Amino acid sequence: MKPTTVIGAGFGGLALAIRLQAAGIPVLLLEQRDKPGGRAYVYEDQGFTFDAGPTVITDPSAIEELFALAGKQLKEYVELLPVTPFYRLCWESGKVFNYDNDQTRLEAQIQQFNPRDVEGYRQFLDYSRAVFKEGYLKLGTVPFLSFRDMLRAAPQLAKLQAWRSVYSKVASYIEDEHLRQAFSFHSLLVGGNPFATSSIYTLIHALEREWGVWFPRGGTGALVQGMIKLFQDLGGEVVLNARVSHMETTGNKIEAVHLEDGRRFLTQAVASNADVVHTYRDLLSQHPAAVKQSNKLQTKRMSNSLFVLYFGLNHHHDQLAHHTVCFGPRYRELIDEIFNHDGLAEDFSLYLHAPCVTDSSLAPEGCGSYYVLAPVPHLGTANLDWTVEGPKLRDRIFAYLEQHYMPGLRSQLVTHRMFTPFDFRDQLNAYHGSAFSVEPVLTQSAWFRPHNRDKTITNLYLVGAGTHPGAGIPGVIGSAKATAGLMLEDLI
């Protein structure tokens, strides 16, 4: 039997490969880089380990399900450690909000910001849980292949006011601006503007309250390695440094996948975990339907990009939380500039990752591994020269962190590297250097998103951030479940 080919060993591609292999379908997993993981790549330098991308595990059950399919337990392959608080949220005014899973502690903190918002938060949590039940548990792994699928979901989505933005819905319950930011920033974790993204994405709050926030011992890369080992234990084949040049088609069927080094792999089906525009524009450029789909996709709104700094210090800043969100002086205005303006803002808001707070093995003794990211416009919004802007932004961020959060940072610096929108474009083939693929606005969600199964090329499937349900680890693992269901129907 010719194997099924999965292009890309990100979380979505890995999860799909495991599901297919566990069901008895031989899978060939092709990864263009020298390590699996996709955006969850790992850098190692002078004893420091840096997770390149996702660092927040919020639905362990979705990962555990993959291992259960093989009759295994997640804990046999990787240990998940609880993270408390989930996030520490900080403002330049000096205000701090430790967001965790203890209702009493949360309400006590909310009381200090605005007593009236305690009841408002309870109502918001009820709403978030209702959206979580409908949008995540019911619809998160259901492929939307026809408009009828969308119509069936429409009444409940209307009841939940899905046309409202995340921020608008939060603001309908909560008065204090700090708290509005605290409960609306989550959509930025999946590339969504809180002022434009559907309020359905408030479900992320309920998701975290339901299952907590976790971190793999050894870093997110250890989870990737655990999933690779599971896939190989099932008999799956992984090929690294396998850069796909194109897919060979006969009529509306893919016959083979070609690599840039000349290798050719016959296949019975292809699931692409690569960027969706790259898949249609570059890998299927000879197929008329793919060209049409590529042109259509290039008119869609893409999510923002990111500027990321990985740095190792000869000092462990134990005053930090594992996850810190550093809000700058502006919120709405800054986000508007990131998503809609041709230029780079003078100010920024940051996410600071300090994993040694939870797992000290990620740095030499007494040292600390860190990364900090700033949301920035993608290259289609602001076509900046990041060889110029990158070093300037790096210096501004290091100075800011040293002043506000990490005294002595620059004198403690052992190693650092940058990852810019150019790198998202060049290393990950991300269209416009987008960090999260298609922007998750309502008119680009569910049926309006690129479908998990192509409607013309009969054995082409999509998995990952660019298809339903969207970005984030729970999203792409959910997409793998949706796509696997379709493939098993078609291939068995």
Swiss-Prot record:
Regulation: Inhibited by NAD and NADP.
GO molecular function, one term: oxidoreductase activity, acting on the CH-CH group of donors
Pfam families named in the record: Amino_oxidase
Keyword Cell membrane (UniProt): yes
Biochemical pathway: Carotenoid biosynthesis; lycopene biosynthesis
Catalytic activity, reaction form: 15-cis-phytoene + 4 A = all-trans-lycopene + 4 AH2
Gene Ontology terms: biological process: carotene biosynthetic process; carotenoid biosynthetic process
Main location: membrane
Residues binding FAD: 5-38
Entry's family note: Belongs to the carotenoid/retinoid oxidoreductase family.
Purpose of the protein: Converts 15-cis-phytoene into all-trans-lycopene via the intermediary of all-trans-phytofluene, all-trans-zeta-carotene and all-trans-neurosporene, by the introduction of four double bonds.
Protein name: Phytoene desaturase (lycopene-forming)
